């Protein structure tokens, strides 16, 4: 039976009584979720709701990214490359959503933003502890960042713990070592609290896998998944920088940074540098 009078009939078995059942709204705690948007501008500016929702949804996605990257690290700890890459694959899709989401915020014009920006005080996306947590898990660690979160003990403790723990990339190399690959000691014994930097000792092994990928497919696939992960992260950073540029130009950020100039520097930060460096060597 088709639609009559442009109305879809409710099927007889569809549940409508939720007086004693869990509903969609109660499962998702929508009362709490939808009351979490609290504009601070006075009088309330129409476009501030967009600004809040943009950042709140980003935080929700970052929560899932952190959940999946930690699960991937745990899978590497158990030498389960396939399960780890399943988590990474999901993260890659989330990253694409996060990057495209900047196009929504880009509808906020410089004039509109300037009308409520002063009400934000020193609050800034730079203070997103989940974003820093993801960076730490991926290996871009910076102990100095913890100072930003001294007033938030839970965030400070989380970042302190992640700073001291091996990154996803560290766990991967440990996994390969246990599986019999000749991973150099410099990769296995490094200071995991430091930001990851290029380790040329790894290049021969990486090149070997690329040039013999049929015999080492799981590791080869992992290399390419990591490259995707980093590229997606850099595309997000670039869209962030460009959105800020079109919205506030070269003004300083609300949190005290130089703004666009500071964001541009993030484009030089890397997670898996050997996987790009090896491309120069392949085929030589």
Curated annotation (Swiss-Prot):
InterPro entries: Trp/Indoleamine_2_3_dOase-like, Trp_2_3_dOase. Heme binds at residue 240. Pathway: Amino-acid degradation; L-tryptophan degradation via kynurenine pathway; L-kynurenine from L-tryptophan: step 1/2. SUPFAM superfamilies: Indolic compounds 2,3-dioxygenase-like. Its cofactor is heme. Substrate binds at residues 51-55, 113, 117, 254. Binds 1 heme group per subunit. It comes from the Bacteria. GO terms for molecular function: heme binding; metal ion binding; tryptophan 2,3-dioxygenase activity. It holds the Pfam family Trp_dioxygenase. Keywords: Dioxygenase, Heme, Iron, Metal-binding, Oxidoreductase, Tryptophan catabolism. It catalyses: L-tryptophan + O2 = N-formyl-L-kynurenine. Its EC number is 1.13.11.11. Belongs to the tryptophan 2,3-dioxygenase family. Homotetramer. Heme-dependent dioxygenase that catalyzes the oxidative cleavage of the L-tryptophan (L-Trp) pyrrole ring and converts L-tryptophan to N-formyl-L-kynurenine. Catalyzes the oxidative cleavage of the indole moiety. This is Tryptophan 2,3-dioxygenase. The gene is kynA.
């Amino acid at each position: 039976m088709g639609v009559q009078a442009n109305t879809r009939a409710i099927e007889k078995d569809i549940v409508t009584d939720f007086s004693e059942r869990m509903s969609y709204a109660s499962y998702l705690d929508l009362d709490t979720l939808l009351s979490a948007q609290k504009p601070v501008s006075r009088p309330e500016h129409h476009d501030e709701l967009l600004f809040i929702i943009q950042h709140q949804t980003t935080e929700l996605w970052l929560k899932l990214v952190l959940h999946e990257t930690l699960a991937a690290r745990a899978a590497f700890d158990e030498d389960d490359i396939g399960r780890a890459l399943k988590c990474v694959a999901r993260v890659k899709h989330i990253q694409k959503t996060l990057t495209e989401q900047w196009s929504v915020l880009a509808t906020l014009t410089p004039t509109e933003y300037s009308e409520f920006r002063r009400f934000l005080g020193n609050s800034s996306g730079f203070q997103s502890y989940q974003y820093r947590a993801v960076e730490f898990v991926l290996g871009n660690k910076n102990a100095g960042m913890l100072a930003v979160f001294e007033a938030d003990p839970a965030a400070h403790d989380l970042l302190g713990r992640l700073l001291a723990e091996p990154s996803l990339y560290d766990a991967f190399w440990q996994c390969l070592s246990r599986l019999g690959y000749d991973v150099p000691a410099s990769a296995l014994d490094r200071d995991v609290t430091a930001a990851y930097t290029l380790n040329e000792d790894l290049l021969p092994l990486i090149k070997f896998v690329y040039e013999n990928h049929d015999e080492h497919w799981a590791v080869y696939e992992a290399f390419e998944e990591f490259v995707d992960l980093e590229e997606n992260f850099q595309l997000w950073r670039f869209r962030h920088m460009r959105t800020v540029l079109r919205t506030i130009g070269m003004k300083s950020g609300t949190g005290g940074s130089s703004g666009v100039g500071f964001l541009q520097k993030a484009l030089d930060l890397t997670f898996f540098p050997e996987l790009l460096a090896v491309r120069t060597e392949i085929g030589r």
